[in-house]
């Protein structure tokens, strides 16, 4: 893409492999992972009951990763970039806005995964992976890639730290509110990163192919 940095293709493929592996472990009810999820969730439950203000705050914070917020923000950004004639960037954002929710919804339909019982927020659907966490990771990565060519070293570090922190806060909120197990959140982060990266890479490849064909047509020989 002309104005958005493209991530290396190996990274999202590794992330997708990790998501698939995690899904398999959950599907076979791997005991160490189950114990880890249960132990961390019970600590979150105990802490939440003892600190109701913490729970109330996270109920607001967690909405930053909600599906409607992600769809609205992605659509708005794609339209703005289209208006600025940054067509490839707009296409990548639009593709990501569709692909990430579709990705976690596909996992929800495929893998039966009950959520923690008696959570502070009740959600009636399968839990792996966390859609909120996937949205936060994807949005953070897209923001970093958009800003990367325009920032110097310090600015890039700040952008990466801010993106990671935002995704972490949303993910932690899902565990703390007992709407997801910790492994659901990890799966969401990995899926969001992978799909956003692949969307950017796919549009970049199409753009490169178009340029190659154009240059070949223009060649008088």
Language model regions located:
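Membrane-helix interface segments
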Residues: 53, 85-90, 117, 153-158
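Hydrophobic alpha-helical transmembrane segments of integral membrane proteins
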Residues: 88-121
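Hydrophobic alpha-helical transmembrane segments
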Residues: 62-85, 139-141, 147
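N-terminal transmembrane-helix/juxtamembrane module of multi-pass inner/ER membrane proteins
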Residues: 1-69, 110-119
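Aromatic-anchored segments of alpha-helical transmembrane domains
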Residues: 22-23, 98-105, 165-175
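Membrane-water interface at transmembrane helix exits
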Residues: 41, 45, 104-112, 144, ...
């Amino acid at each position: 893409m002309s104005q958005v940095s493209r991530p290396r293709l190996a990274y999202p493929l590794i992330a997708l492999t990790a998501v698939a592996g995690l899904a398999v472990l959950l599907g076979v009810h791997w005991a160490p992972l189950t114990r880890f999820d249960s132990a961390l969730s019970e600590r979150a439950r105990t802490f939440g009951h003892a600190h109701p203000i913490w729970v109330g705050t996270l109920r607001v914070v967690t909405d930053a990763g909600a599906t409607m917020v992600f769809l609205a923000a992605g659509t708005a950004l794609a339209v703005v970039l289209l208006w600025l004639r940054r067509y490839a960037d707009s296409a990548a954002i639009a593709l990501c806005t569709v692909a990430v929710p579709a990705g976690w919804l596909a996992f929800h339909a495929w893998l039966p995964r009950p959520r923690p019982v008696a959570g502070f927020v009740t959600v009636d659907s399968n839990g792996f992976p966390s859609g909120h966490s996937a949205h936060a990771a994807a949005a953070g990565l897209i923001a970093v890639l958009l800003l990367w060519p325009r920032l110097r070293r310090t600015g890039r570090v700040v952008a990466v730290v801010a993106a990671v922190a935002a995704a972490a806060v949303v993910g932690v909120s899902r565990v703390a509110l007992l709407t997801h197990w910790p492994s659901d959140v990890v799966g969401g982060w990995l899926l969001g990163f992978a799909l956003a990266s692949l969307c950017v890479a796919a549009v970049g490849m199409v753009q490169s192919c178009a340029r190659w064909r154009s240059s070949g047509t223009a060649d008088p020989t």
